[in-house]
Amino acid sequence: EKYGKQYASEIMKKSKRVYRELVEQADDIGDDNPMAYNELFALSFVAPYVASDKNIPPETVQEMMRRSLYHIKWYFAKTDLNTAKGKAENKKSVVKYAKWYTPEKETQYPTSFKVDFVGQPHEGACYYRITCCPICTYADKLGVRELMPLFCELDEVMITLQHGVLHREHTIADGGEYCDYY
């Protein structure tokens, strides 16, 4: 809506090719990686930014991503983080990944997400930390680091759609040693 139909169409056409290239050139984090969708989703928004030669402002890319999240809000709304069931679902997905990322997997996929549960602020809280983020690492390699803090801000949107509140003090994108989710 901001750039006209012809320009948007050209960028989206280029984006498809760029997206495939980005996925092919990304570090292998495992085909069966339970968190791989996070990187694939982010790359679908990095692609038009790269395809436009960074002529689309990062804030516009963030808005595109935010709108897509609201478009599938029904999916996130199925989980209510205010209920025991919702908290259990959230924890289950994080624990599933933590169990998947064994020392053998870490050797095989050293640049994948690293998750831990160090420093839980409140007993019973949904809390974890990401201490290595392949999305940030790849953004640095691609020269699009400016997108990362904006993408991280969208974690709050996802948590809000799950009827929760994200309390965050650190992100790797902002120079922190980890991203905290609480």
Language-model region placement:
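Non-catalytic recognition/regulatory regions in large multidomain proteins
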Residues: G124-R129, A139, R145-F151, E169-D174
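Short coil/loop linkers at secondary-structure junctions
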Residues: Q6, P57-E59, R145, V165
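N-terminal, charged low-complexity regulatory/assembly segments
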Residues: E1-S52
